[in-house]
UniProtKB/Swiss-Prot annotation:
The gene is rhaR. Coiled coil: none annotated. Activates expression of the rhaSR operon in response to L-rhamnose. Binds DNA as a dimer. This is HTH-type transcriptional activator RhaR. The record marks D246 as: Interaction with sigma-70. It comes from Escherichia coli O157:H7. One of its GO terms (biological process) is rhamnose metabolic process. One of its GO terms (molecular function) is DNA-binding transcription factor activity.
């Protein structure tokens, strides 16, 4: 088995007293599977890519939020103008008396739900705090580490306030149409999605929404939905015993032959080949 790449805190933190830092990825390039000896929060600002976390693929774009534990293994592939920030931290160095474990999924172990989403309002507020955090964590002045940790605590609580699961934007949310569209797409894994109906409900221009979506994500709406469905199919092929025809239905493809064509085009192998190759990892 090939040696697992591991990123070390000595290469990312200025001293052994520093608990928090910000690692920009402008843009994020393809990055091989790796682990760390620190933890991180990942926030995607724009573009798209394939993020594989603990063998589960996610098609990521603006608003995706991940909580990564040190022992988690992940990689980035098929990136397209993918811009994100990693807020990296060492749990054992945090000194503030906050309920870190309650606020950060998987804080003390590789458990809990790692994938969430942020709407435009949450992203704007997070970006502001991260900017301050990045400034403080790069300072060599008294109390810089303490200030950075205070800002990290503020960020963690802010994310708790604004995050939501990928397919369930709160009904009282005042988020933008783009946020609501991405949530609706995530909830359409098994069922058909009609953009014209969505636009009628939202009283918006289909043409303008298509343009906004492509500008922010680097994909068309159909491309995004197709790739989200393929990612879900990859996961089911590896981690379930469902028949390929049943997986096709679970992922919103009414015809299993068409599913095989799309899956092969997106991944370079047939569903059965994918299942055989990846079942050897379990």
């Amino acid at each position: 088995m090939a040696h697992q790449l591991k990123l070390l805190k000595d290469d990312f933190f200025a001293s052994d007293q520093q608990a928090v830092a910000v690692a920009d990825r402008y843009p994020q390039d393809v990055f091989a599977e790796h682990t760390h000896d620190f933890c991180e929060l990942v926030i995607v600002w724009r573009g798209n890519g394939l993020h594989v976390l603990n063998d589960r693929p996610y098609r990521i774009t603006r608003g995706d939020l991940f909580y990564i534990h040190a022992d988690d293994k992940h990689s980035y592939a098929s990136v397209n103008d993918l811009v994100l920030q990693n807020i990296i931290y060492c749990p054992e160095r945090l000194k503030l008396n906050l309920d870190w474990q309650g606020a950060i999924p998987g804080f003390s172990a590789s458990a809990g739900q790692p994938h969430w989403r942020l709407g435009s309002m949450g992203m704007a507020q997070a970006r502001q705090v991260i900017g301050q955090l990045e400034h403080e964590s790069s300072q060599h002045v008294p109390f810089a580490n303490e200030m950075a940790e205070l800002l990290f605590g503020q960020l963690v609580m802010l994310l708790n306030r604004h995050r939501y699961t990928s397919d369930s934007l709160p009904p009282t949310s005042s988020e933008t149409l783009l946020d609501k569209l991405i949530t609706r797409l995530a909830a359409s894994l098994k069922s058909p999605f009609a953009l014209d109906k969505f636009c009628d409900e939202a009283s918006c221009s289909e043409r303008v929404l298509r343009q906004q979506f492509r500008q922010q994500t680097g994909m068309t709406i159909n491309q995004y939905l197709r790739q989200v469905r393929v990612c879900h199919a990859q996961y089911l092929l590896q981690h379930s015993r469902l028949l390929i025809s049943d997986i096709s239905t679970e992922c919103g493809f009414e015809d299993s032959n068409y599913f095989s064509v799309v899956f092969t085009r997106e991944t370079g192998m047939t569903p059965s080949q994918w299942r055989h190759l990846n079942s050897q990892k379990d």
